[in-house]
C-alpha cells in the first residue's frame, strides 16, 4: 500500500514537472523573441512619407505639413525621456514619448543609432532614425529635399 502511495506521488510530481515545462518553455521563448522583434521602414513617396512599423502603428506624414526638419545627435540621451504609449525593446522604441526637450512627441527609432531626424509636423514633434548614422543622414537628406521641392 505504501508503495502504491509513493508511486502515485512520483507520478504526480512528474506530471507537475511536465506542466511547468509546458508553461515555462513558451514563456521563455516569447520573452526572448519579444526583446528583439519589430522593424522600422521609412519610405519616401512623391507627396508623403510612410513609416511602416512592425510592433506598433504605422505613420504617414505629408511633406507640405512639415514646418521644420533637423538632423540631431544624442538629443534623446537624457534621463527624463519616457514612453507614455507604444512599443519598446532592446532594438526599437516606437510610439508616444515625453521628455524635457520636446515635451510630448512621437518616436520611431533604432536603439543602435544615436543620431536622429527631428521634424515639427503641424505642431507635433516626430523623431526618427535609421539603423546607423549613415542611414539616418540619408533619411534626413531625402525628406529635406522633398520638403524643399514641396515649398517651391
Roles of regions detected by a PLM:
Residues 1-40:
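Alpha-helical transmembrane spans
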Residues 2-4, 75, 111-152:
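Terminal and domain-flanking low-complexity segments
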Residues 5-8, 17, 69, 90, ...:
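Compositionally biased, intrinsically disordered low-complexity segments
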Residues 17-28, 45, 73-87:
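Short low-complexity stretches enriched in small and charged residues
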Residues 46, 50, 67, 71, ...:
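Motif-centric detector for short Cys/His coordination patterns
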Amino acid at each position: 500500500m505504501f508503495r502504491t502511495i509513493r508511486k502515485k506521488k512520483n507520478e504526480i510530481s512528474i506530471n507537475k514537472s511536465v506542466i511547468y515545462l509546458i508553461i515555462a518553455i513558451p514563456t521563455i521563448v516569447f520573452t526572448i523573441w519579444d526583446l528583439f522583434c519589430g522593424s522600422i521602414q521609412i519610405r519616401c513617396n512623391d507627396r508623403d512619407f510612410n513609416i511602416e512599423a512592425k510592433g506598433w502603428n504605422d505613420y504617414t506624414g505629408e511633406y507640405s505639413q512639415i514646418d521644420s526638419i533637423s538632423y540631431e545627435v544624442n538629443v534623446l540621451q537624457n534621463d527624463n525621456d519616457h514612453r507614455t504609449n507604444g512599443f519598446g525593446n532592446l532594438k526599437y522604441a516606437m510610439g508616444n514619448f515625453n521628455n524635457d526637450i520636446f515635451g510630448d512627441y512621437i518616436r520611431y527609432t533604432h536603439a543602435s543609432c544615436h543620431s536622429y531626424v527631428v521634424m515639427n509636423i503641424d505642431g507635433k514633434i516626430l523623431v526618427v532614425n535609421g539603423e546607423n548614422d549613415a542611414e539616418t543622414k540619408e533619411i534626413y537628406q531625402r525628406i529635406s529635399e522633398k520638403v524643399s521641392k514641396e515649398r517651391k
